[in-house]
Amino acid sequence: AVPTLVNDYTDGLLDLTVELAGNERRPSEMRLEAGLFDGETKIFAETRDVEVFDSLAVVELTAEVPDVNPWSAESPSLYTLVITLADSRGRVLESVSSRIGFRTSEVKGGRFLLNGKAIYLKGTNMHEHDPVRGHTIDEALMLKDIRLMKMNNINAVRTSHYPQPERFYELCDEYGLYLIDEANIESHGIGYHPDITLANRPEWLGQHMFRTVRMVERDKNHPSVIIWSLGNEAGDGQNFVETYKWIKGRDESRPVQYERAEKSTRTNERHTDIWCPMYPSIERVESYALSEGQPGFDRPYIMCEYAHSMGNSTGNLQDYWDVIEKYGILQGGFIWDWVDQGLLETSEEGEEYFAYGGDYGEVGSPSDGNFCCNGLVGPDRTPHPALTEVKKVYQYVGFNPADLTRGLVTISNKYDFTNLSYFTINWEVLANGILFRSGNLRQISLEPGDSLTVEIPWGDIAPAPDTEYHLNLHVSRSDEWGIVPQDHMYASEQMLLPFHAAAKTAASSVASVAAGASGEESLALIDTRTEGSDLTFAGEGFEVVFDMAAGVMKSYRVAGQELIMSGPRPDFWRAPIDNDYGNGMEKRNAPWREAGGRA
């Protein structure tokens, strides 16, 4: 079934191909009925009389369905398609059903469009992983993943690096997640050189094609699958040109992508519809956008992997999205990755922990250490701090100060298909962190992509001395939104308010000294003296000594007591994090570790 949208994306078009296999030598007269249901209501039905032989019979049906509810991750509207085969006397022989969604997925004018609209893919990569069962996951864990993603504004998953269990696709159809479905093809270890990669060896075409066909034929009816991926890190060559061509001939309703397709040295045949690099720098991302219109820079740019979230990481995510939201050709990316692949173990002391490379086998066994633990959540789906950052950066409601002295704030609706009238915006003013005023803005009607400046009605504020005022904004829904519980907070913002009590008017002590003031209100003059390389500043009850040769403070005494063992020195080093070790930073920047000691 290929359900798409026509007539300015308002009506549905259902192209249905049914294959019938007979088991008798003589033809059998059959009746085929296709019915489409919206809930319990049948909105379309068509019947065909067919003759079925022992060979395959193909029946094609096309129908236009007016005023359908389009499927999207924000509004995953599904219809039930029921196909029934009966004999000539009307007895039902077989009946099958499938839940389908009407939507379009295409690349036009250098943009990836869903239902005719350029959208952002705020995605993550995901491996199958259970901390106890390993690669075997059940429906409860699938639902937990989907719920967590939706609660943290993630709208897309790349099924790295193989198709997921079919039930996962059904749940993504139902609750709304965009999927890049990736063929189970990776030959990273072979190497990428055109002379050795399996992608260029004709004897491996069959295996490339087999895995591609299997994925497409199994998953083709799922509306959540919006893009096909030819594989991952498997080099590039003619085999991928052929699998690309096969998909485009079999399914015209989705784009196809492959990261290595832009790195081929043996073929000039284009075989990716999307420019989908791995781990580009922010400068490289912007460079692509600035090159739009030049040869080769005419496709949407969606990173298939970025923001490697291993350990203490994901810190520059906002910097990426500042650039992404600046240029139309940049349309998001997929964080690496969703879940740490640790396994639950119990220590000799009876404490549970998550084990990874190095915890198994004899000492010295080959291991990638904790390289399998680079997720936004732990193996048990406990969120890491990075997920909080992802939720904030990916949020769909933006706030910017317009004129905070008058309480004016500009609200932007970054949803693709959802009006903000479904949400409540709660606000609160804090005085030194303590609640001072609060209220809410209900039913602000704001269409996707629009902005509106509103007044926050906090009234008159008489600033208190030594008090900081902040405005907090929170966006929530009072109802359940699919799999997300009611009253969940989807977006937030904090702004420092420009309210300050008038400063006390008093002449500064420094000014008094400079003017030669005397008496109790003046400070005692600081004594300065030099002895060798020592420069000393002394005043009432204190003394500070600097070593001018070394350029450091060597002594700080108060009331005759020494307060320091040695003075501060410049430090140009920080503790490396996991991603630093991954790219050799601790070796590359080693001279800076000792630079402070030589300063």
Question: Which positions does each model-derived feature cover?
Answer:
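Substrate-binding/catalytic cleft of secreted carbohydrate-active enzymes
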Residues: 146-149, 156-373
